[in-house]
């Protein structure tokens, strides 16, 4: 029974997150479940089953008296008040956040470097045997990746992937269950360390944004124990925005680029009041991160992470700008291709049902096979010698940013034997062939590796590929102009490292659709000499990539089916002529103020949305407010609850025994008690409120209809009602209902609960036909909404609102639906689904009135149709002294709404 109850208790959680082979996937009713849970808790519904009761000490033993703990708590509270009064709560939070993230980043880098050194040590120690060296080279990353995938899957599947797409969704207002918890933080940190320590082409920046956000959420919960602003949940969003900047800042020691990058990838509209928070926390975190490197004697002083030494007097010539522009345009196409390839890999694996089902049963097989393939191809004595397979990502960037020219004669003799630059010039190949093979192989390897179900990002692999492409162009320019470019009797040699910097920023910007990668590159290299070529290449790459594909993070949002709102895009002027009346759904699920419970049940059958519109009457359709689905379910469940049926039975029994009695309530039954064997599961307490309790715990109920009925005394699960179950399973005929009830009774023979019951309970059994008749009578009664929490001012739009203004409002306010009204009359509803289809140009004709091509040929001088005008006149009233308001043009209505 405990195992069954545990399985039922875990069932609602599966509605939030669905683990797939590569990426996880969230369902469409993501925020609805969280709000239903909040409504259940607020209304005092039954708690989910959490296992057998544990033997805890008495509550009085947990109270603190005059002990040392009490004195420590008083002292900590006084210190907190002193610091808050002198420094301020925001500064304390941001300092702690920056310090913790710097420590986490430095410890992770130290562990990753140790893992990579261990792999190199094993490979060099077994160089006498190629077979043993290959086995060591392949087994090491396979073990680490398998452990990372298994550990993440067991502890917190939400830790899989980058984290930036989910943070973008969370900052928009969507609630993702268990995404910012402690166990997800542990799974993300350990899983990311093992994944990066394996040497796979994976990144750190995206997961670190998620780690910083989790750290900020946990820190807010901890500091809320002391009171203050941390108890305000609306403040958490501002702290999460600052945490995203800290994640990038302490990852690359790039505070300015980190703040700008976090704003670009997570926000559509950014609150300027959070600007200083991000800069302060990111700067402090980057400072501590580099100080720890100096303390560990990794660096002599605080320097850039990949310091370059380009010449400053003449870094590039004006004639080289076309080459930089070519890098930007090519990077734009390459970034779009990378996003397309990454999404196509996931879609192909999902469409192959047989392979997908097999790999879903063997979850660790897919990451192991991918790691085995990539490790085999990068084996240094094998094919890896033609793509610098022995170099890590950090060593690869250091060599690619080198300002020396590799194709110059005599370079190999000048390089020292242990130099890592020799990896790009193997004995049986040249620099150009090695760079081409490296770019092609790393391109599809990175797109494939980022689909492994482990914590990983794609920024750093793309950054390295872009640097290699820029280096290829730079080496080609150096080969074409071996003596450099002559300018005013002066000769300046080509610097291939500058081309690598430009290529890295351009390709990373094309994949992420950001311009701040240019600033990140400047902070990474410590030089700003190539600012003009970098900006030109990044802008051109973004222009090309944004016209072809969405960003990598938006692509993952679509793969995971997270709620999102696409951008309007460029050059689509017809979108500015589309109005809300062209895209709204006219068949709005609603309930009237004078409706019956049968109407409530029909409304719940018609829609799966989390909100229902409340109107005055079906004729007038005057919008009075909105009511949550959980509230409607609670009303219907209370009307058909076992408590009401028990009361009905007692009243009928009282009428039969004493028909001449004038008492309104039923008489108290006799107190004779006997044992009752109950074979049904129930989520409610016994009918009698005495100290007698069942000897075995009741099983948790499955349907969500009875969640909010915990305060009413109820009976068995059979008394939940056939009509109530038909809300989710359809309305069966009486014969089928009785057969189903009998089969359920046979299946529940093993679920025995011994309890104490009165003789009145034993005599009050109703047949299924009587239950159906009683429920039909209850469904015909009118609904009383006085006990419901109704939103009296739901968000509304008028039918003449433009698509551009609607998109801006949805983005700014973070709403997911809006009712469309005309002089208070409900005429439609617009949700994220309709808005997304209108923007993407794929509006269907199901319930949506669209005039192709999206009302672009609408006559702006024409008003509404005759039917609508007649209805508005009738609603306005024939005896009104004022005339009907004139309907202006779209531009006029937009100006008035501003």
From Swiss-Prot:
Residues 643-672, 686-717, 856-898 are annotated as: Disordered. Chloride binds at residues 162, 459, 553. A motif (Selectivity filter part_2) lies at residues 203-207. It is a multi-pass membrane protein. Residues 705-717 have a biased composition (Polar residues). Common gate kinetics are down-regulated by intracellular ATP. Inhibited by AK-42, a derivative of meclofenamate. Inhibited by Cd(2+). Inhibited by Zn(2+) and PKC activation. Inhibited at acidic pH. CCLN2:HEPACAM channel conductance is up-regulated upon hypo-osmolarity. A motif (Selectivity filter part_1) lies at residues 161-165. The modification N-acetylalanine is found at residue 2. One of its GO terms (biological process) is stabilization of membrane potential. The chain crosses the membrane at residues 88-121, 130-155, 180-198, 205-223, 275-295, 321-349, 358-377, 429-449, 457-480, 531-548. The modification Phosphothreonine is found at residue 20. One of its GO terms (molecular function) is volume-sensitive chloride channel activity. Changing residue 865 to R: In HALD2; increased voltage-gated chloride currents due to higher channel open probabilities at physiological cell membrane potentials. Phosphorylated. Activated by dephosphorylation. A motif (Basolateral membrane sorting) lies at residues 812-813. Residues 584-642, 790-850 form the CBS domain. GO terms for cellular component: astrocyte end-foot; axon initial segment; basolateral plasma membrane; chloride channel complex; dendritic spine membrane; myelin sheath; perikaryon; plasma membrane. Residues 16-34 are annotated as: Essential for channel gating by both voltage and cell volume. Changing residue 719 to L: Found in a patient with childhood absence epilepsy; uncertain significance. Residues 36-49 are annotated as: Modulates channel gating by both voltage and cell volume. It catalyses: chloride(in) = chloride(out); thiocyanate(in) = thiocyanate(out); bromide(in) = bromide(out); nitrate(in) = nitrate(out). Pfam families: Voltage_CLC (PF00654). Voltage-gated and osmosensitive chloride channel. Forms a homodimeric channel where each subunit has its own ion conduction pathway. Conducts double-barreled currents controlled by two types of gates, two fast glutamate gates that control each subunit independently and a slow common gate that opens and shuts off both subunits simultaneously. Displays inward rectification currents activated upon membrane hyperpolarization and extracellular hypotonicity. Contributes to chloride conductance involved in neuron excitability. Homodimer. Interacts with auxiliary subunit HEPACAM. It is linked to Epilepsy, idiopathic generalized 11: A disorder characterized by recurring generalized seizures in the absence of detectable brain lesions and/or metabolic abnormalities. Generalized seizures arise diffusely and simultaneously from both hemispheres of the brain. Juvenile absence epilepsy 2: A subtype of idiopathic generalized epilepsy characterized by onset occurring around puberty, absence seizures, generalized tonic-clonic seizures (GTCS), GTCS on awakening, and myoclonic seizures. This is Chloride channel protein 2. It comes from Homo sapiens.
């Amino acid at each position: 029974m405990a195992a069954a109850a545990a399985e039922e208790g875990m069932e609602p959680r599966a509605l939030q997150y669905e683990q797939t082979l590569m990426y996880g996937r969230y369902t469409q009713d993501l925020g609805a479940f969280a709000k239903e849970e909040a409504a259940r808790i607020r209304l005092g519904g039954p708690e989910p089953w959490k296992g057998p009761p544990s033997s805890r000490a008495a509550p009085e033993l947990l109270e603190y008296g005059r002990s040392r703990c009490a004195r420590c708590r008083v002292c900590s509270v006084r210190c907190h008040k002193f610091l808050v009064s002198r420094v301020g709560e925001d500064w304390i939070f941001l300092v702690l956040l920056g310090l913790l993230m710097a420590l986490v980043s430095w410890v992770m880098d130290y562990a990753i470097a140790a893992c990579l050194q261990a792999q190199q040590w094993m490979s060099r120690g077994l160089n006498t045997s190629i077979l043993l060296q290959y086995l060591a080279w392949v087994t090491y990353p396979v073990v680490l990746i398998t452990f990372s995938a298994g550990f993440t899957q067991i502890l917190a599947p939400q830790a899989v992937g980058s984290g930036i797409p989910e943070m973008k969704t969370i900052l928009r207002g969507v609630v993702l269950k268990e995404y910012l918890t402690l166990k997800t933080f542990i799974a993300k940190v350990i899983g990311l360390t093992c994944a990066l320590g394996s040497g796979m082409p994976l990144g750190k920046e995206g997961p670190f944004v998620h780690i910083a956000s989790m750290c900020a959420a946990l820190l807010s919960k901890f500091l809320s124990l002391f009171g203050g602003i941390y108890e305000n949940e609306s403040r958490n969003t501002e702290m999460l925005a600052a945490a995203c900047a800290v994640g990038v800042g302490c990852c690359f020691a790039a505070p300015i680029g980190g703040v700008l990058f976090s704003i670009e990838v997570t926000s559509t509209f950014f609150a300027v009041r959070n600007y200083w928070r991000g800069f302060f926390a990111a700067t402090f975190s980057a400072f501590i991160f580099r100080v720890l490197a100096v303390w560990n004697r990794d660096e002599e002083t605080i320097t850039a992470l990949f310091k370059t030494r380009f010449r400053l007097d003449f870094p590039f010539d004006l004639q080289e700008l076309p080459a930089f522009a070519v890098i930007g345009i090519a990077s734009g196409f390459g970034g779009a291709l990378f996003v397309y390839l990454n999404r196509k890999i996931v879609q192909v694996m999902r469409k192959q049902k047989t392979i997908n089902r097999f790999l879903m049963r063997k979850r660790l097989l897919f990451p192991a096979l991918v790691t085995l393939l990539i490790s085999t191809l990068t084996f240094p004595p094998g094919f890896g010698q033609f793509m610098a397979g022995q170099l890590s990502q950090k060593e690869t960037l250091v060599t690619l940013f080198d300002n020396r020219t590799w194709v110059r004669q005599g370079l190999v003799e000048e390089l020292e034997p242990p130099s890592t630059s020799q990896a790009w010039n193997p004995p049986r190949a040249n620099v150009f062939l090695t760079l081409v093979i490296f770019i092609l192989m790393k391109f599809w390897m990175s797109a494939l590796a980022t689909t492994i179900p482990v914590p990983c990002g794609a920024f750093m692999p793309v950054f390295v590929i872009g640097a290699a492409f820029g280096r290829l162009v730079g080496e080609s320019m150096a080969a074409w102009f071996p003596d450099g470019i002559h300018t005013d009797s002066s000769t300046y040699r080509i610097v291939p490292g500058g081309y690598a910097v430009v290529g890295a920023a351009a390709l990373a910007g094309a994949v992420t659709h950001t311009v701040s990668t240019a600033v990140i590159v400047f902070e990474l290299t410590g030089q700003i000499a190539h600012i003009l070529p970098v900006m030109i290449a990044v802008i051109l790459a973004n222009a090309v990539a944004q016209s072809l594909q969405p960003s990598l993070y938006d692509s993952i949002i679509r793969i995971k089916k997270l709620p999102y709102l696409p951008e309007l895009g460029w050059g689509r002027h017809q979108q500015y002529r589309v109005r809300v009346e062209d895209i709204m759904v006219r068949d709005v699920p609603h309930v009237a103020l004078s409706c019956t419970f049968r109407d409530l049940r029909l409304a719940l059958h018609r829609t799966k949305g989390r909100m229902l519109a409340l109107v005055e009457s079906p004729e007038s359709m005057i919008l009075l407010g909105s009511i949550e689905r959980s509230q409607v379910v609670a009303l219907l469940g209370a009307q058909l609850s076992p408590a009401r049926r028990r009361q009905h039975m007692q009243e009928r029994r009282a009428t039969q025994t004493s028909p001449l009695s004038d008492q309104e309530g039923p008489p108290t039954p006799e107190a004779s008690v006997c044992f009752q064997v109950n074979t049904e599961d129930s989520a409610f307490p016994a009918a009698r409120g005495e100290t007698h309790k069942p000897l075995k715990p009741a099983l948790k109920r499955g349907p969500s209809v009875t969640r909010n009925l915990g305060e009413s005394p109820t009976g068995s699960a059979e008394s939940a009602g056939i009509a109530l179950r038909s809300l989710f399973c359809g309305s069966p005929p009486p014969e089928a209902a009785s057969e189903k009830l009998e089969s359920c009774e046979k299946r529940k023979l093993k679920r025995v609960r011994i309890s104490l019951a009165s003789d009145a309970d034993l005599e009050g059994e109703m047949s299924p036909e009587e239950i159906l008749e009683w429920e039909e009578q209850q469904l015909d009664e009118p609904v009383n909404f006085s006990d419901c929490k109704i939103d009296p001012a739901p968000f509304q739009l008028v039918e003449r609102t433009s698509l551009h203004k609607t998109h801006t409002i949805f983005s700014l306010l973070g709403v997911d639906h809006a009712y469309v009204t005309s002089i208070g009359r409900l005429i439609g509803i617009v949700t994220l689904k309709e808005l997304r289809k209108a923007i993407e140009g794929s509006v269907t004709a199901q319930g949506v009135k669209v005039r192709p091509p999206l009302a672009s040929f609408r006559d702006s001088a024409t008003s509404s149709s005759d039917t609508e005008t007649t209805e508005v006149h009738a609603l306005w009233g024939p005896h009104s002294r004022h005339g009907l308001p004139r309907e202006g043009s779209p531009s006029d209505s937009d100006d008035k709404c501003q």
